[in-house]
Amino acid sequence: MNAPDGLQRCFVLHRRPYSESSLILDIFSEEFGRITLMSKGARSKRSNLKGALQPFTPLLLKWSGKGAMKTLRQAEPISLGLPLTGINLYSALYVNELIGRVLMQEVSMPGLFHDYLFALTELAQADNPEPALRRFELALLAAMGYGVDFLHCAGTGEPIDPQMTYRYREQKGFIASVRRDNLTFLGNELIAISERRFLTKEQLQAAKRFTRIALKPYLGGKPLKSRELFIQMRIPRTRSMEK
């Protein structure tokens, strides 16, 4: 994919130091998808980019190069970084890691970029991050072509009955079932997932269960670092409450 002629809307997903003064950036861009950039001298004391090239800060970037790693040529922050703290910050880190693990390099996904921006905006304002996370996971699955019909029984084609139970079969959909296990969902839960509107705790839990099932093949067996960090954060807080 050719380098852009002008500035592109982007976010930093992850950054790591390179040599004494540079950074390697994993970027999610509106028009070019995921790309890897080297920012030369970004860590030096004289660099005015040191504070700007951070996750969750809306950026305008320009780069050059044809290889797997491009060179950052220009960077301008659009605004201050989104105000993410506590559990919402860890949730946003999870979203970034999910994109980095699941999306291929240099595949344009402007629609998903807008879903990502919406998710970050929601997380910056939400008391409970779970609905925003589930909506983004579902948007990510849809962007990757993971097509599931939540509104019709895969066995009969009939509309989903809110009161009935359905069992998920990968690459087929939901089939009416009397069994109850990790792969079964109530009809009202499937309708809520389809609409991405979760009115009850049970619907939200069902959405989380489904996205974990659907994302597992893409993530493999390697644990998510953001999830481990979140667990580590919760343990000290739980211990302090017990005291």
Curated annotation (Swiss-Prot):
One GO cellular component term noted in the UniProt record for this chain: bacterial nucleoid
Keywords for the protein's UniProt record, in alphabetical order: DNA damage, DNA recombination, DNA repair
Organism domain of life: Bacteria
Single GO biological process annotation from the record: DNA recombination
Cross-referenced Pfam families: RecO_C (PF02565), RecO_N (PF11967)
UniProt xrefs under InterPro entries: ARFGAP/RecO, DNA_rep/recomb_RecO_N, NA-bd_OB-fold, RecO, RecO_C
Family to which the UniProt record says this protein belongs: Belongs to the RecO family.
Cited PANTHER family: DNA REPAIR PROTEIN RECO
Function: Involved in DNA repair and RecF pathway recombination.
Name of the protein in question: DNA repair protein RecO
Native source organism of the sequence: Vibrio vulnificus (strain CMCP6)
Lineage: Bacteria, Pseudomonadati, Pseudomonadota, Gammaproteobacteria, Vibrionales
Gene assigned in the entry: recO
